[in-house]
Amino acid sequence: MSVAGLITEEQLDRAMRLVGRGRALLGIVGQPGSGKSTLSAALLAALDERGVRTALVGMDGFHIAHRALTELGLVEIKGAPSTFDVAGYVALLRRLRDPAEELVWAPEFRREIEDAIQSAVPVRADVQLVITEGNYLLVDGPWRPIRDLLDEVWYADVPEDLRRQRLAARHEFYGRTPEQAWERTLGSDERNARTVAATRGLADLVVTL
């Protein structure tokens, strides 16, 4: 099955209905390890087959720099809501909301270096649909403006055991021992996951992966 084949016709039609009313912004939200990137990639591929011009911008590009988190004593909870530049993310979404700018550059998080690369993702004026993925798109507080900037938010849902296994495997892949991987998965990652799970009912659509 192709990546695009992971998207149902109903889901694709729903995304297509967002296109054509000016630029649309679609949020993909979910717990750590829920498959947000898989869902986003599948949707991008399916929309590309329909001739829709798209771009993917991740919330993770607004991680506070690893060095800064270390200096602040926050590196052990990296990924928590307090470890992101929320205002910067909101500002970017506002720029993307209005395609008057010929070109907008967005940052991209690179797991292999545990940091974001600035001006890594180009979003041109002719892009019809921007997909933005992240954990906290529906969280309240300083994150609240994000919901108002998005046309819809879809929640990526997956069984908890599978989600935790994926997350631990990811941590191992990037250099943690199995023990360290599970400690992180069941520690700060689990606290973050509960924060995200509490927002599930606010999503416009729940997509089971």
Label each residue range with its predicted role.
Residues 1-27:
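Extreme N-terminal, non-catalytic leader segments
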Residues 30:
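The Walker A (P-loop) glycine that initiates the GxxxxGKT/S ATP-binding motif of P-loop NTPases
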Residues 33:
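Walker A (P-loop) phosphate-binding loop of P-loop NTPases
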Residues 36:
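Conserved lysine of the Walker
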Residues 39:
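Hydrophobic positions on the alpha1 helix immediately C-terminal to the Walker A/P-loop
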Residues 55, 64-113:
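Conserved nucleotide-sensing/catalytic segment adjacent to the nucleotide-binding pocket
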Residues 113-170:
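ATP-dependent NMP and nucleoside kinases share a basic, alpha-helical "lid"
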Residues 118-119, 142-143, 172-209:
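Small-molecule kinase domains that catalyze NTP-dependent phosphoryl transfer to phosphate-bearing small molecules
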